[in-house]
């Protein structure tokens, strides 16, 4: 059946089409009252009202702007550009990261690059510019990308899960169990219940206490990038710290070379007094390069082992907590395969519809009995929110 479009026409909106020979009444002509009863008056056009949530019932002003889902997002995140970009609630440390990178590289391009390009080679500022733009690109992608947040269970899904657990059907409240077990590559993995998101967390998922979200393949919350590091932005985070270590080491070596060349034939202390900007770069790079190199090496080990920081700290697949060491079910037993799986796999789509509109409350067509549930819930697989 083809789709048809319907249009509501008011009974008094337009006259019926007249025959070709009929005479049209003039604009000032008025109907003459006949002997019969008067025709009924045309009904008034319907009045539409909207409530704050966008529904068709209730009081509200006409044409109120519907809210998008990022405006009512339950986590502690901040959104920009109409929900296209997101950041953690506390961005002070992230601003400090931007300040340190921009200040150090800015001073290097202004006070060191001209001298080194003139005395040595023009390749020095070119290499520094390439590293700088790559570092900034990876940092912004890490900070403003959804790390893999799982949407919280709706009221219907949470109620259906509690009813599924309580098989007796009694009205007494019984809290859901804290764990479930699933088999992954021959290894039993526990799924913990999140009382905030009202669902069993998928494997490798953890609830971030800072952002108040469940994040897939949760690695850690990094205040330096202002975001959680998870399944969807870990590759950008790893590329950021790795490229930042190269940029820091490159600037440190170039500044030392600059000061050494300037100090030839003169006092080294007087050279330091003449170039205070280079001294500031040297201090910043010296105190930051060790932590950046150490962090890059640690995450290289995690990538090669297909582990997360959260799993390594908790000792999930080792004997750090005094228990028996178990095999990592997510490892492919090959360093190259693990690196490709973590860094080169397809980027999964975001599961939170930030740009979508908040759906209005639907009116049920028939009354609901007290012994029936108020809504239908999705199957348990969808409530888990991810694949093993």
From Swiss-Prot:
Annotated ranges, domain DHHC: 192-242
Full protein name: Palmitoyltransferase ZDHHC18
EC number: 2.3.1.225
GO annotation, biological process: innate immune response; negative regulation of cGAS/STING signaling pathway; negative regulation of innate immune response; peptidyl-L-cysteine S-palmitoylation; protein palmitoylation; protein targeting to membrane
Record's bilayer topology term: Multi-pass membrane protein
Catalytic residues in the record: 222 (s-palmitoyl cysteine intermediate)
Metal-binding is among the record's keywords: no
Region (Disordered): 1-67, 364-388
Alphabetical keyword list: Acyltransferase, Golgi apparatus, Immunity, Innate immunity, Lipoprotein, Membrane, Palmitate, Phosphoprotein, Transferase, Transmembrane, Transmembrane helix
Spans traversing the lipid bilayer: 91-111, 120-140, 236-256, 278-298
Domain characteristics, as noted in the entry: The DHHC domain is required for palmitoyltransferase activity.
